[in-house]
Amino acid sequence: MQQEIMEAVKKAKELSRPRNFTQSMDVILNIKDLDVNKPENRFDEEVSLPNGRGKDVKIAVIADGELALQAKNAGADLVITKDELEELGKNRKEAKKLANQYEFFVAQADMMPLVGRFMGPVLGPRKKMPKPVPATINPEPILNKLRDTVKVRIKDQPVVHTVVGTEDMDDEKLAENIEAVLQTIDRKLEKGRNQLKSMYVKTTMGPVVRVI
């Protein structure tokens, strides 16, 4: 299937009009024979793309002390201290803004109860509750992995729609990233990719191109 994916990716690039920004490349998977009313058929998985996402991903770290310092050194886009976390609890508008602005959150494990109290109401519904990490850990490997990570989820519709890179990435690398998403489908669905009704690729603003 990789050849078909590469050809579709190439066509999606050709059909996409030039924009004044680098567009993402998306994959859309329509699933058949899946009852999403059953909780066991819904999932929310994180997939590490072998060739990365092609653009920066904004990550916030909630931590104090040494972990906060290491997170800054590791290139975290935002570090939220305990005091700042408590302030966010009083400012729902700002908390929502941060929840929408940052794709992933990481939190010092012993601060998770406070995170749940002050940020849980805005992060929970967005499926962005932080990953807890020990205060003594070096967060750099975790942050590096998250920068290459996308969400693959099925909620109330039997459809997966996720980013797999950017339009300026090599066709083969994009195809390999799509394969990583398909491997998740193989693992999560009873019949794996045999349950694919159709698959499309597209740039952010471009038309869809059918793969299967």
UniProtKB/Swiss-Prot annotation:
GO biological process: regulation of translation; translation
Family annotation (SUPFAM superfamilies): Ribosomal protein L1
Stretches assigned to coiled coil: none
Any GO molecular function: structural constituent of ribosome
Pfam families: Ribosomal_L1
GO cellular component terms given for this protein: large ribosomal subunit
InterPro entries to which the protein is assigned, alphabetical: Ribosomal_uL1, Ribosomal_uL1-like, Ribosomal_uL1/biogenesis, Ribosomal_uL1_3-a/b-sand, Ribosomal_uL1_arc
Record's keyword terms, sorted: Repressor, Ribonucleoprotein, Ribosomal protein, RNA-binding, rRNA-binding, Translation regulation, tRNA-binding
Physiological role: Binds directly to 23S rRNA. Probably involved in E site tRNA release.
Stated family: Belongs to the universal ribosomal protein uL1 family.
Subunit organization: Part of the 50S ribosomal subunit.
Protein name: Large ribosomal subunit protein uL1
Gene: rpl1
